[in-house]
Amino acid sequence: VVKPWLNDNIITINYIKQKNGGKHRAINKGIEAAKGDYFFIVDSDDFLPEDSLELVQQHIEGIKNDTTFAGVCGTKCYPNNQRVGGAFPYEILDTDSVSFRIVHKIKGDMAEVWKTSVLKEFPFPEFEGEKFVTEAVVWNKIAKKYKLRYFNKNIYICEYLDDGLTKNIRRHHRNSPKASQLFYSEIIKDNRFDKITRIKSAINFW
């Protein structure tokens, strides 16, 4: 798939192949090799609208010199243009990713575009024999120090497949017990989360 793009030589592509060790290891490897200022994670089954990167660049201009921001974040949608998680009630919202869920109570996956330097600061933990670490383990840590600029534009088109990570989240947690215990234990200790969320995490932890 990638070879024809390399041969076209229209843009610079640094293609890295490694044994499947889970998405989190792929992200770590990508961050290690990344030379750009921003990092956009796009799953192999998904794609970007034609104006996606243009919209991202427009919003980056407003935060790129502000060290309190970890990046920008647009909305995800299905191929029919319906937003994942329903309506997004803001045009622009500057907040951290935990407050985004807990305070503003917004649902649905979002499309984060991170400053590469921030992801280098917060690499994903890796556990031998485990292939899954929920992204929230890292995103929640970043939220203690940085915020994101959320904007109400679809920049990412996705289809949730029956064998995808989101569809099988419980099974992935069972198959990666150390990573899952880390995730739940950190929520239990984190006062930013409401009591119900922390109780549910305690139940899942045990």
Regions found by a protein language model. Name each.
Residues V1-I16, E61:
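Acidic donor-binding segment of Leloir-type glycosyltransferases
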Residues Q18-A34:
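Glycine-rich, basic loop-to-helix element that forms the pyrophosphate-binding segment
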Residues D43-F47:
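The conserved acidic donor/metal-binding loop of glycosyltransferases
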Residues N154, C158, N168-F193:
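Catalytic core of nucleotide-sugar-dependent glycosyltransferases
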